[in-house]
């Protein structure tokens, strides 16, 4: 099965808008990140499973509003007992699924219905503030949060303090 991005037929590359004469850091860069497996892990409410026993690609499940990552995989905390995993290891869900029994967890591959858009530049916070109610100025590297952006549900994953 071939992974096709949800933005495959609408995403165009190039420079748009007022970019003439501006420094590279002053430009807002918008890029879709392709070729990743995206899946969600949810622990059932009545489960007593010890989460400290779980490692995905060598990573622990992160605590509230945090993320954990290595070179291939990133795990975001989405809510109580709920995590979003994305990885360049396309068969990771198959490799790790044996840790999660069906009585305690639901694992859903959502790669076909989600996309990751990376924003980069000095003005990213200003763009997010225009349509998102979160105080993005307080975000630090490794923080994540769910919110809305002009009515669209988003998950913000703060990768770096560098623009």
Where in the sequence are the language-model features?
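Basic, glycine/lysine-rich polyanion-binding surfaces/domains
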Residues: 1-163
């Amino acid at each position: 099965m071939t992974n096709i991005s949800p933005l495959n037929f609408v995403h165009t590359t190039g420079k748009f808008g007022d970019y003439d004469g501006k420094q590279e850091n002053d430009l807002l860069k918008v890029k879709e990140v392709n070729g990743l497996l995206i899946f969600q892990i949810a622990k059932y409410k009545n489960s007593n499973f010890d989460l400290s026993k779980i490692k995905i690609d060598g990573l622990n499940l992160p605590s509230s509003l945090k993320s954990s990552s290595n070179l291939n995989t990133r795990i975001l905390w989405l809510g109580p007992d709920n995590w979003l995993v994305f990885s360049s290891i396309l068969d990771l869900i198959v490799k790790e699924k044996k840790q999660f029994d069906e009585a305690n967890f639901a694992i859903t591959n959502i790669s076909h219905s989600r996309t990751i858009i990376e924003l980069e530049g000095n003005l990213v916070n200003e763009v997010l503030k225009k349509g998102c109610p979160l105080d993005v100025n307080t975000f630090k590297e490794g923080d994540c949060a769910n919110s809305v952006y002009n009515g669209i549900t988003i998950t913000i994953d703060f990768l770096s303090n560098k623009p």
